[in-house]
Amino acid sequence: MRSSYSEEDVILLLKDITGMVEPQPAKVREKLIQSGKHYSEMLPVEYVPTDQYMQVYHNALKHYAKPVANAVGMLADKIIENKGKKIVLVSLARAGIPIGILVKRYIKFKYGINVPHYSISIIRGRGIDDNAMKYLLEKYRPQQILSVSYTHLRAHETRSNL
């Protein structure tokens, strides 16, 4: 499956639908959703970010890189402290992947451990991907599997600012 992420950072446990579903613009998808089609049966058109978007991104990066790095470090340290070194990170596809990658990289940098990081899908109204969970549970003990998300990061960032 084609991805902008390196397999060294994350293994996507997603069904490859390349060539099976044609990406559609947001307005078309919204009309289809209103007519009863489920959003998970469609793909968005992936646009190249505009210069204005990239300017906002770089500005946010400049202002928030250090607090995010501190929160990632605190979270990763707590993970190792509470779960040990034989962990498996699991993030939700799209929104959870960046946090999972940052935590994985921090653990490798500080502890010298290359922990696995997988990403799975959860679909509103349909639930978590059973096949992905089955795969993970066949390969790892339940105690090793740890879900990471932006919510975990925000909780640690908030505590560090108290």
Segments the model singles out, each with a brief description of its role:
Residues 24-28, 63, 160:
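Extended, composition-driven regions rather than compact fold-specific motifs
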Residues 86-92:
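Short glycine-rich phosphate-binding loop at a beta-alpha junction
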